[in-house]
Amino acid sequence: MTNDETNRPAELKKDIGLVSALAIVVGMVLGAGAFMKPPAVMAAAGDSTWALAAWVIGAVFSMAGGLTLCELGVLYPRTGGVYVYLDEIYGPKVAYLYGWMLTFIFGPATIGALAGYFSSVFCLLFGIPDHYLPVIGLAVMAFVLFVNSVGVKQAGYLQVLATFCKLIPIVLLAVFGLWKGNGHVLNLSTGVAASATFSVAVIATLFAYDGWAQVASVAGEMKNPGKILPRAVVGGLIFLSVVYIVINVALLKVLSPSEMVALGHDASAIAAQKLFGLYGGNLISVGIMVSIVGGLNGYVMTLSRIVFTMAERHQLPGSGALSRIEPDSKTPVNAGILLVALSFI
């Protein structure tokens, strides 16, 4: 090894392929919302046909945003994603405000909420006292941070594994719901007046589709961002659209719209119990926990890159430490530690 190679500063490693990028898109979007959102959309729409239409329109809107992101990603294939795009288009002030919001508000709030929800489901499933909630939440965040600290390739493996595992209960619920369910799907009223307008139902679906844009934050670590990013975003959104619509149809085959609205967040668990017996609810609980791990991993992986990019530009306190890349793992470990620490607080 020459002196030039020894003294060369560490750089982020391009280890993310198409499968890992797809897993980031699907894993960050397909969280607990797949189980929780259908009743909320149904309540807002007031009718099964309009509820399904809301999911379709939400998919179209998300795809429009995804195609826009692809154009920007090909134009600016760098680490930082939307932060970089805002900087290039609107200037450093707008980008700074966006990055500051993600670093100190959105990122910690989202990661902390996901960890808290994981610990709640974990304690409920295994009968653990509630005073262990903070410990379990910290443990799952520490686990995700550790995997991300080992390397982006390992974080990608975890994302693929979590995405595959979370699809198992969703696929089982969808397949057996369509197979064994005998309910009607279209033109069924909830039996109560719609709780909001159709536009609110569409907005509710957009929250379920949210998260796909974060994959652009790791564009600088993709092997070929010009090809991988567009394929991951478009392919991921098409897959997610199919999953959401199929899971809604499956639920309608098992539960009536009025039952879905009345059961609320428990609708998927009750549907699983009808299909698989007493252990059906546990299946959904495990699916939710795996979904949360995938979401946590995706957010720590992508948001830490925004922190890193801001620190490179000396826009954060302690930028010298936050912009450091570990020589062995080629990852911004300190940026991830900051996110997890703020999330726990």
How does the language model describe each region?
Residues 1-49, 62-67, 79:
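Membrane-interface "cap" regions at the ends of multi-pass membrane proteins
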Residues 40, 53, 63-141, 145-149, ...:
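Hydrophobic transmembrane alpha-helices that form the core helical bundles
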Residues 84-85, 91, 123-124, 128, ...:
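TM-loop-TM module centered on a large, flexible mid-protein loop between adjacent transmembrane helices
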Residues 7-12, 52, 128-132, 160-285:
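Helix-loop-helix junctions that connect adjacent transmembrane segments
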Residues 34-40, 115, 147-153, 279-280, ...:
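Transmembrane helix-loop junctions in multi-pass membrane proteins
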Residues 56, 60-64, 104, 108, ...:
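Generic alpha-helical transmembrane segments of integral inner-membrane proteins
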Residues 43-48, 75-79, 88-94, 220-228, ...:
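Juxtamembrane helix-boundary/capping and inter-helix hinge elements in multi-pass membrane proteins
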Residues 15-25, 60, 91-104, 136-140, ...:
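Select transmembrane alpha-helical segments in multipass membrane proteins
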